[in-house]
Amino acid sequence: GKQYDLYAGALFHTEVEALEWQEAGSRWLIKTNRGDEFTAQYIGTGTGPLHVPKLPGIAGIEAFKGHSFHTSRWDYNYTGGDPKGAKMDGLANKRVGIIGTGATSVQCVPHLAKACKELYVFQRTPSSIDIRNNAPTDPEWFNEISTEGWQQRWLENFTANQTGDNTVEDLVMDGWTDLSRRVRSKIMSLPPEKMTPANMIAAFEESDFEKMEQIRARVNTIVEDNVTAEKLKAWYRQLCKRPCFHDDYLQAYNEPGTYLVDTDGQGVEKITEKGIVVAGKEYELDCIIYASGFEVGTEYKRRAGYDMVGRDGQKLSEYWADGMRTKHGVHV
């Protein structure tokens, strides 16, 4: 906030509770959970689709007597550390379980593995973990590419690579552009006379299989325990689940005291006062961390926190009762 001088025009840690159109004055009336009331001629609702935490529907979740929290509500008072990466010294003598192995967990596990006395990662389905190659930016390289308008050029190049444009250059060169270019290259290598829908699909599948075999083979080169390595291999096609890219996640399973608890696709059986049960075995824990993601597909007013009221008192939820519709729109 301070870096970009946002405090003069922003209300942080504030939730909008009501948004109502006022015919008199032709303005929107905005009410917040802090008691604010103000008006605006135009509004932009950048509430996003993924911000309401979702806890797993596991039997006994309320019975646990230890500490617990969702990853999006990280409790630094318990773990120690801070958002800048300070050591989480509050976990040095703790047995911690984390439920989930998706994109959030992949980011958390490497830090937890170094901080906890014991870390148990409860896995239903393994994520595909490709190389991220996250390294410090070379200043000389950046000076070469950061000429006026470079952000727009890179945005357009990324969009072109992701939307099927046969652009030769890949400025971004990350896992997402590689995925698109790899598939497109395989398809475009077909002779013109064999460019049929069936052959194009087969080429797509071949490209996907080759990449997933590469990702699975990488697990063996990193994870020292063979049983753990096999359980960490994504067995599905790359886009069946959100692809993940990380340089330290797989390595975390080589840390002493870090254990993968694979549930063989069944998920956690139940939660007790003392910990988590999988396949009849109870794992006693001091803390449970829920890396269980966010609500998807719930009605917009539940996730936004308000129901927009327009002309003649009509609520947006009523207007959208049969599906979303709008005359114009801007994607945020």
Please provide the spans of the model-predicted regions.
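Hydrophobic/small residue at the entry helix of a nucleotide-binding pocket
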Residues: 104
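N-terminal FAD-binding dinucleotide-binding subdomain shared by FAD-dependent oxidases/monooxygenases
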Residues: 1-62, 66, 77, 88-93, ...
